[in-house]
Design a protein with these regions (language model features):
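Short strand-connecting beta-turns/loops that link adjacent beta-strands
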Residues: 9-12, 55, 66-69, 79-83, ...
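Conserved acetyl-CoA-binding loop-helix of GNAT-fold acetyltransferases
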Residues: 91, 97-110, 137
């Protein structure tokens, strides 16, 4: 059983290491969504996390198991064009492939619809075909839009490979 709630400023200290451990470093290698081979450094920091939690028309949604342990999170932001941006989907690497990511995706789409959004979009590192395939199985499709990875900004991580780009994926809601 997974329960959901919106993150608050009080969650920042737990969320930052949870997200960073889900994407980067040795702990992330326990799951299939690791970026450790292409990016080092952090995925987020306390300032960025607080900004996302307290942002206008935005939400960080938390998933907890039946014991109250944090098992996942996702960032959502309503955009001016009635789209919703989904980012930072994180599942505890030890709990991946157990349906938590799918539950977070479903919850995200429900929240976006409640906000009046008709489309969900996200950006994924292009070098992650297995992750892109995961989202495609959930109804998302590449839009053809790309953007460069911010290689010169260590707040987003330290590239181990040059020329990283993001591919945009979207799904009508």
């Amino acid at each position: 059983m997974v329960s959901f709630r919106a993150a608050t400023a009080a969650d920042v200290d737990a969320l930052v290491p949870f997200v960073n451990g889900g994407y980067r470093g040795e702990s992330s290698k326990r799951g299939w969504t690791t970026e450790a081979d292409i990016l080092g450094g952090q995925r987020t920091d306390p300032g960025k996390m607080l900004e996302m939690i307290e942002g206008s028309a935005a939400r960080v949604e938390l998933a907890h198991d039946e014991r109250g342990a944090l098992v996942g999170c996702v960032y959502l932001k309503k955009e001016p064009d009635a789209s919703c941006y989904l980012g930072m989907l994180t599942v505890d690497p030890a709990r991946q492939a157990g349906g938590i990511g799918k539950l977070l995706m479903t919850r995200s789409e429900e929240l976006a619809r409640a906000w009046g959004c008709g489309r969900m979009r996200m950006t994924v590192i292009s070098m992650r075909p297995e992750l892109i395939a995961y989202y495609e199985r959930r109804g998302y499709a590449k839009t053809g839009a790309t953007e460069p990875f911010p290689e010169d900004d260590p707040r987003f991580g330290l590239p181990k490979v040059r020329g990283l780009t993001f591919a945009e994926l979207a799904k009508p809601l």
